[in-house]
């Protein structure tokens, strides 16, 4: 991968990583039912894709809410719409088109009908681990667009970070210290029951 491409991809991820008060307020401002919300950037198919993918990656358990219950898809839509520049939005849109075409080879089929197994197969086949060779990137190292694997990994990273930084998860699931003034030296298991601290 060329340095320029690596820097471009790092820039996309770094924009999300630098959590500023405006990003936090954007995350906290994402409210509403995941079924009835109207996205600002995402198309209806992209909304379905992000919503299903988020719940497959972070499903509801007995002790934790699912990604859609803490409005992760709404945050991703708002982040792409308000933070990414026009060029990055176009690159993201092209990546969505490509990945949805893989998930739904028949363009006339309804994406709502895609099963959890189809999503999992997409992830198994196309979301490569660090160090694995990306055949799309190898075939065209000069391409300015994200490969399917790069896009799925960036979406995964965004889903996890939006989930961890949501108010519900930060205050009620992770160890929460609203005024972290004291210094604690000890075993994490002993101090927080094994939970990491929220931001």
What are these regions (language model features)?
Residues 64, 71-199:
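Mature-region segments of soluble proteins
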Residues 1, 5, 21-56:
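C-terminal segment of N-terminal export signals and the immediately downstream linker at the start
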Residues 1-17:
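N-terminal secretory signal peptides and thylakoid transit peptides that target proteins
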Residues 46-78:
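Post-signal-peptide N-terminal segment of Sec-exported extracytoplasmic proteins
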Residues 18-22, 134:
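Short amphipathic alpha-helical interaction/hinge segments
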Residues 37-41, 59-67, 84-87:
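A short N-terminal beta->alpha junction/helix N-cap motif
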Residues 15, 41-45, 68:
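Short, contiguous, pocket-lining structural segments
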């Amino acid at each position: 991968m060329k340095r320029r491409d690596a820097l471009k991809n790092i820039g996309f991820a770094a924009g999300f990583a630098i959590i500023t008060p405006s990003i936090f307020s954007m995350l906290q401002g994402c409210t509403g039912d995941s079924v009835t919300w109207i996205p600002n950037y995402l198309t209806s198919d992209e909304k379905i894709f992000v919503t299903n993918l988020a719940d497959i990656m972070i499903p509801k358990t007995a002790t934790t809410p699912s990604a859609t219950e803490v409005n992760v898809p709404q945050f991703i839509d708002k982040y792409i719409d308000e933070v990414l520049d026009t060029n990055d939005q176009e690159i993201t849109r092209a990546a969505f088109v490509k990945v949805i075409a893989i998930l739904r080879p028949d363009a006339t089929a309804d994406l709502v009908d895609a099963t959890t197994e189809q999503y999992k197969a997409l992830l198994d086949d196309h979301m490569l681990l660090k160090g694995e060779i990306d055949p799309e990137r190898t075939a065209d190292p000069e391409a300015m667009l994200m490969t399917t694997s790069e896009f799925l990994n960036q979406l995964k990273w965004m889903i996890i970070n939006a989930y961890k930084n949501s108010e519900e998860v930060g205050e009620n699931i992770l160890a929460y210290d609203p005024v972290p003034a004291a210094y604690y030296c000890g075993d994490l298991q002993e101090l927080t029951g094994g939970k990491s601290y929220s931001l």
